[in-house]
Amino acid sequence: MPLPTDPSPSLSAYAHPERLVTGDWLYFHLGKPGLAIVESDENVLLYDVGHIPGAVKVDWHTDLNDPKVRDYITGEQFADLMNRKGIARDDTVVIYGDKSNWWAAYALWVFTLFGHPDVRLLNGGRDLWLAERRDTSLAVPNKTSTSYPVVNRNDAPIRAFKDDVLAILGTQPLIDVRSLDEYTGKCTEMPDSPEESVLRAGHIPTARSIPWEMTVDKSGRFRSSEELERLYDFITPNDKTIVYCRIGERSSHTWFVLTHLLGKPGVRNYDGSWTEWGNTVRVPITAGESPGAVPV
């Protein structure tokens, strides 16, 4: 049975406040039946130096991605993962992580591909929990389940592929959430990830640059609904927006903002993102600060 929605006034103005929890709410519900806490970080070593009591670790790279094909795990693999982590289908899952929930949002997006009914983010993530001097633990929960059902992944509503992006150029909003240096073509990789360099730099023509970090404040919490609405005021109710970054992790964060905080319908995450686009033969690319025009 899902746990109650966080009643905090700080969340009430969002379109779907039931998709967020505050540190106060999570602290109050620690150890309660029906709650599963997941930590998912870019730095996969952080969990081992202290985590929220009762949290299990989900490694975005080894747990959520297929080990052979560049794709996500299957329904059978997801059910096995949930059972190994002791998560039931009717659990309320709260996910948090480092970097203002980059990878936590990515994990939540993958959980959504499998239709997990109640999955939420901890507003502010790991860093805010620590900044507020809340409890941490080194203990790894020893719990398993055998009841999580096999659910086929449903990509279509929230996932976009390269051909989907090509089909909407110039007709639907396309948002690049990477840094401005990546967008303009000044660099071909993130500064701390030289191994992920691509062959071509720049951005997809017509894409607007709205870096993901514009959606959070200094504490890592999401900005107010009013601030977010101003940031995305060009999106209309009938638009079918696609967001992208480098491999889909930062754009999962923006997908969460648009879908759950602002209630924009039909938003999809192009997880192939620049790693695919910047290495693909004969796809259009533009550089500079202008979105660029639809290729003729």
Swiss-Prot record:
Name of the protein in its database record: Putative thiosulfate sulfurtransferase SseA
Alphabetical UniProt keywords: Repeat, Transferase
Signal peptide: none
Domain free text: Contains two rhodanese domains with different primary structures but with near identical secondary structure conformations suggesting a common evolutionary origin. Only the C-terminal rhodanese domain contains the catalytic cysteine residue.
Record-annotated Rhodanese domain positions: 31-138, 168-286
PROSITE patterns: RHODANESE_1 (PS00380), RHODANESE_2 (PS00683), RHODANESE_3 (PS50206)
Transmembrane segment boundaries: none
Active site: C245
Amino acids binding substrate: R250
Gene: sseA
Molecular function, one GO term: thiosulfate-cyanide sulfurtransferase activity
Annotated catalysed reactions: thiosulfate + hydrogen cyanide = thiocyanate + sulfite + 2 H(+)
EC nos: 2.8.1.1
Gene3D superfamilies xref list: Rhodanese-like domain
